[in-house]
Amino acid sequence: MLNVTDLRGQTPSKSDIRRALPRGGTDVWSVLPIVQPVVEDVQNRGAEAALDYGEKFDHIRPASVRVPAEVIAAAENTLDPLVRESIEESIRRVRKVHAEQKPSEHTTELSPGGTVTERFMPIDRVGLYVPGGNAVYPSSVIMNTVPAQEAGVNSLVVASPPQAEHGGWPHPTILAACSILGVDEVWAVGGGQAVALLAYGDDAAGLEPVDMITGPGNIFVTAAKRLVRGVVGTDSEAGPTEIAVLADASANAVNVAYDLISQAEHDVMAASVLITDSEQLAKDVNREIEARYSITRNAERVAEALRGAQSGIVLVDDISVGIQVADQYAAEHLEIHTENARAVAEQITNAGAIFVGDFSPVPLGDYSAGSNHVLPTSGSARFSAGLSTHTFLRPVNLIEYDEAALKDVSQVVINFANAEDLPAHGEAIRARFENLPTTDEA
């Protein structure tokens, strides 16, 4: 089922590896002309425009953008107790990890009386997008909300698409997760129009704009984020989900097959890639996938994803080459199924998250490992990171020099002012001291 790319007997460069690897992705540029008028209309007409587009695209128009408090409360009250227990346990685990991510203020003394202090200031108001589509994602509510709360974000709003089968409001499980987390502002709006409304708000409708937008979504959500970036901050662009498994002959073929299938379940564009130095394992995994995918509830979606050009098996000479390949692929999720898996994992530099050993599968990270599941895709893990408490914090420097400390470094500043032909900079220093030479004399 999975196509095979054979890199054995080669010494490929980074460029060669990137060209050879199966890779999906979405062409965001192609939908920008569709999304831009939506964003501009929502900027001009606010909530009414957002509701109009929801009715046009999704054939549903909620009674209001903001979900009433009683609807949110009812969703929590009717939540399945087992689902509630799982949500609460995942919140506990994710909160424990993200609470420890918060950095501490620190001060550096450059000279007596001259200090620079770095403080970490939370974003004031954040919009968290939770998609609808093929599945219900209360886990995304957790993964976006908890790090923002741990960072100290003052105001949170969740936006999620309205559902016709639920009275035009977001899915009750989404609303229940919001309620459990203490998020009482939820907007029943999805797609690019949700991103635009979060960015620009609507004063007349009582919808305050945000300072940052995070959360995964489809290509239209991604395009809208690109269009409003600069008006607000955004997290990294999220393409279709992906898993890479780096495995040797010691790997359990059944478990590897299940992990590849589980990621393919998300989306027909999802990528599932096995990187291995064992031809026998490759054959075994392909056989196990063929035997097992059809019994999953989402078999048709899984089959299309696994047969797509974005999925496949990559054969390499040895695990050291496999590490190079994995680094160039820079997977959203990377599983290590090798001997000495931790030692291999420590050699990886590019991945959204690394899952070490047979008992650390990606589905654990999707829900309750404690790590975050909002991760960079499409190779962007080479230069970006997943969602964390850091995402919602801004480092701000406080520069504090007394007279002696400034005088000690004043000539350095004046010399730079001369070199850059910005004499007023030097004069701003000299004016504070009587005996310093003028900028021209320095």
Curated annotation (Swiss-Prot):
GO terms for biological process: L-histidine biosynthetic process. Residues 1-20 are annotated as: Disordered. Substrate binds at residues 241, 263, 266, 333, 366, 420, 425. SUPFAM superfamilies: ALDH-like. It holds the Pfam family Histidinol_dh. Binds 1 zinc ion per subunit. Keywords: Amino-acid biosynthesis, Histidine biosynthesis, Metal-binding, NAD, Oxidoreductase, Zinc. GO terms for molecular function: histidinol dehydrogenase activity; NAD binding; zinc ion binding. The keyword Ligase does not apply. Its cofactor is Zn(2+). InterPro entries: Ald_DH/histidinol_DH (IPR016161), Histidinol_DH_CS (IPR001692), Histidinol_DH_monofunct (IPR022695), Hstdl_DH (IPR012131). Gene3D superfamilies: 1.20.5.1300, Nitrogenase molybdenum iron protein domain. GO terms for cellular component: cytosol. It catalyses: L-histidinol + 2 NAD(+) + H2O = L-histidine + 2 NADH + 3 H(+). NAD(+) binds at residues 129, 193, 218. Zn(2+) binds at residues 263, 266, 366, 425. It comes from the Bacteria. Its EC number is 1.1.1.23. The keyword Zinc applies. The active site is at 332 (proton acceptor), 333 (proton acceptor). Belongs to the histidinol dehydrogenase family. PANTHER family: HISTIDINE BIOSYNTHESIS TRIFUNCTIONAL PROTEIN (PTHR21256:SF2), HISTIDINOL DEHYDROGENASE HDH (PTHR21256). HAMAP family: HisD. This is Histidinol dehydrogenase. The gene is hisD.
